[in-house]
């Protein structure tokens, strides 16, 4: 796979129509903290991102995703682990023990319904897994919340097998108009903002090889309901791929791999 292949695969799967998961909608309606998952525009993002993970990984490893060992790092509400289970993947889920917004500090109807076992993380960055355990690590809005980014990436490098992948989504971009607006309103939930240069530097420092990086999400998805959400998503993706407005997008995201030559 080369860079052009990575980009084409991402673009095609980001725009691939996905049926909404009604079970997630029903479960989300019973918990205010999960309400965004009942919004079609928001849930659609998680659906196409997990579809992209499946497509990229199977192209990369030349294996079915069900044959690979996957870690949902900081699984939170459990919706990513649940969606992975829905496509036949056995995923290991973990989250910080005791944090208010972790799997252990909030109502978790999806985790309970799907009987997802969540491994507690009791150290700020050390992960309770052996070296070279996983083929894939998923970070859905997690890296920006860790206290030591480099130490966490070094741990991910340690637990990945050679040529293993890390997918990092929802990394808040430092020029994002939505992040700046949130800060002006006094909301610093995302107090660490990232640039592409910063991402590349961190990956280089932790011996992870960048394969693809992109901007995503210009238009808000969680709190706004769009009449034709798929059309709005196509427009959003076009703006963040083809126009200078990408430099005000909410997120930058990337996929990287562990070199086969590095221990």
Q: How would you name each of these model-derived features?
A:
Residues 68, 131-133, 164:
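Surface-exposed loop/turn positions
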Residues 138:
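A conserved beta-strand element that flanks and buttresses the S-adenosyl-L-methionine
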Residues 142:
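Hydrophobic adenine-recognition pocket in adenosine-nucleotide-binding enzymes
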Residues 147-155, 165-262:
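S-adenosyl-L-methionine-dependent methyltransferase catalytic module, highlighting the catalytic core
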Residues 1-128, 249-252:
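Conserved N-terminal segment of class I S-adenosyl-L-methionine
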Residues 82-85, 153-157:
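A structural alpha-helix within SAM-dependent methyltransferase catalytic domains
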